[in-house]
């Protein structure tokens, strides 16, 4: 059985922030976020987005082991700007398990309904300058620091839950010449 626990303590927040490092520990393509930045994101005193956002985050637990995490953000500013009524999901990570995925997204969807939102959209951050998006191809390439890495199975779980892709974002790698003669010319 999966239990969903709302993050209310600093210890739980540390678990929430550290979870991707555990889930992807054997994945060389994963680039971890900066621990202090992620901790600050959820600190109302340090993140100015809390002036116009409401946010909550949860841990998924099974038999005392963490098996997933998800955050939810209600950005009043973004909804006003884009004329939407959306709840954002963010920082979602989970094992390949239908019950875990269901429990995490059901929790966000429930809060979205309580707040009167029409839809859940993501993964997005507090602002449009935060990490966003979900990897749908290129799992064999090192992820970028500004985007999320996720396992390929996420797509199947989100599709099964009724989520659809909103937009394609393309990330490119530019090789910078290291030949001294070329560099001197510039």
Outline where the language-model segments fall:
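Short amphipathic alpha-helix that is part of the acyltransferase structural core
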Residues: 1-45, 169
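A short helix-loop-beta-strand connector motif used in the catalytic cores of GNAT acetyltransferases and
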Residues: 43-59
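Extracellular structured ligand-interaction cores
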Residues: 55, 86, 119, 169-171
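Conserved beta-hairpin
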Residues: 55-70, 159-161, 165-168
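Acyltransferase donor/substrate-recognition loop-hinge adjacent to the catalytic core
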Residues: 148-186
């Amino acid at each position: 059985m999966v239990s969903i626990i709302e993050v209310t303590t600093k210890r739980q927040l540390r678990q929430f922030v550290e979870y991707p490092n555990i889930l992807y520990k054997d994945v060389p393509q994963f680039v971890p976020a900066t621990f202090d930045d992620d901790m600050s994101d959820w600190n109302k005193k340090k993140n100015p987005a809390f002036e116009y956002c409401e946010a909550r985050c949860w841990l998924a637990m099974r038999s005392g082991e963490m098996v997933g995490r998800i955050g939810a953000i209600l950005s009043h500013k973004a909804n006003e700007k884009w004329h939407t009524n959306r709840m954002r999901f963010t920082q979602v990570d989970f094992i390949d398990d239908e019950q875990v995925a269901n429990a995490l997204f059901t929790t966000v969807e429930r809060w979205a309904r309580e707040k009167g939102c029409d839809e859940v959209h993501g993964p997005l951050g507090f602002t449009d300058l935060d990490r966003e998006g979900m990897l749908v191809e290129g799992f064999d390439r090192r992820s970028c620091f500004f985007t999320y890495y996720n396992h390929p199975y996420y797509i199947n779980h989100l599709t099964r839950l009724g989520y659809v892709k909103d937009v394609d974002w393309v990330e490119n790698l530019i090789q910078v010449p290291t030949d001294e003669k070329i560099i001197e010319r510039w």
